[in-house]
């Protein structure tokens, strides 16, 4: 709707405005929400882009070390019991796993963009793995 210019008009001699009672004036002066200011929220794309820049800049491991170590030991139990791991071996495994996952998510994102979407879906990951020759 277009804005229109307001022009001054002469009063037509109506009733004079009545004075409000003190309690009514106090009620109107107080905000209806109780004076609680809502915390500032960024729009979702802003936060996502900030996180992307942050993690692309960083070099630290993204998966916590102890949960990853427990997972490796649990998987290794299926193949041979009483296996021992050097801490450097677990570190090397974690580096390799994270590099693989980052690369896979990059390819998955490209598949989603190719499908004219910005949200990755399981079918994008399946396509990325299939194109890599990892899954027939």
From Swiss-Prot:
GO terms for cellular component: heterochromatin; mating-type region heterochromatin; nucleosome; nucleus; pericentric heterochromatin; subtelomeric heterochromatin. GO terms for biological process: DNA damage response; heterochromatin boundary formation; heterochromatin formation; mitotic sister chromatid biorientation; pericentric heterochromatin formation. The modification N6,N6-dimethyllysine is found at residues 5, 15, 28, 37, 80. Residues 19-32 have a biased composition (Low complexity). The modification N6-acetyllysine is found at residues 10, 15, 19, 24, 28, 37, 57, 65, 123. The modification N6-methyllysine is found at residues 5, 10, 19, 24, 28, 37, 80. GO terms for molecular function: chromatin-protein adaptor activity; DNA binding; protein heterodimerization activity; structural constituent of chromatin. Its main location: nucleus. Residues 1-45 are annotated as: Disordered. It is found in: Nucleus; Chromosome. Phosphorylated by ark1 to form H3S10ph in a cell cycle-dependent manner during mitosis and meiosis. H3S10ph is also formed by ssp2, promotes subsequent H3K14ac formation by gcn5, and is required for transcriptional activation through TBP recruitment to the promoters. Dephosphorylation is performed by sds21. Mono-, di- and trimethylated by the COMPASS complex to form H3K4me1/2/3. H3K4me activates gene expression by regulating transcription elongation and plays a role in telomere length maintenance. H3K4me enrichment correlates with transcription levels, and occurs in a 5' to 3' gradient with H3K4me3 enrichment at the 5'-end of genes, shifting to H3K4me2 and then H3K4me1. Methylated by clr4 to form H3K9me1. H3K9me1 represents a specific tag for epigenetic transcriptional repression by recruiting swi6/HP1 to methylated histones. Targeting to histone probably involves clr3 and rik1. The modification N6,N6,N6-trimethyllysine is found at residues 5, 28, 37, 80. PROSITE patterns: HISTONE_H3_1, HISTONE_H3_2. Transmembrane segments: none annotated. The keyword Nucleus applies. Keywords: Acetylation, Chromosome, DNA-binding, Methylation, Nucleosome core, Nucleus, Phosphoprotein. Belongs to the histone H3 family. The nucleosome is a histone octamer containing two molecules each of H2A, H2B, H3 and H4 assembled in one H3-H4 heterotetramer and two H2A-H2B heterodimers. The octamer wraps approximately 147 bp of DNA. Core component of nucleosome. Nucleosomes wrap and compact DNA into chromatin, limiting DNA accessibility to the cellular machineries which require DNA as a template. Histones thereby play a central role in transcription regulation, DNA repair, DNA replication and chromosomal stability. DNA accessibility is regulated via a complex set of post-translational modifications of histones, also called histone code, and nucleosome remodeling. This is Histone H3.3.
């Amino acid at each position: 709707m277009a804005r229109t210019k307001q022009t001054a008009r002469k009063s037509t001699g109506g009733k004079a405005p009545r004075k409000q009672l003190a309690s009514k004036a106090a009620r109107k002066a107080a905000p209806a929400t109780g004076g609680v200011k809502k915390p500032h929220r960024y729009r979702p794309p802003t936060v996502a882009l900030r996180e992307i820049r942050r993690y692309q800049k960083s070099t630290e491991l993204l998966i916590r070390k102890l949960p990853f170590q427990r997972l490796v030991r649990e998987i290794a139990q299926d193949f041979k019991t009483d296996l021992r791991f050097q801490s450097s071996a677990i570190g090397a495994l974690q580096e390799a796993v994270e590099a693989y996952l980052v690369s896979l998510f990059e390819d998955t994102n490209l598949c989603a963009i190719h499908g004219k979407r910005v949200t990755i879906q399981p079918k994008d990951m399946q396509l990325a793995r299939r194109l890599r020759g990892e899954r027939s």
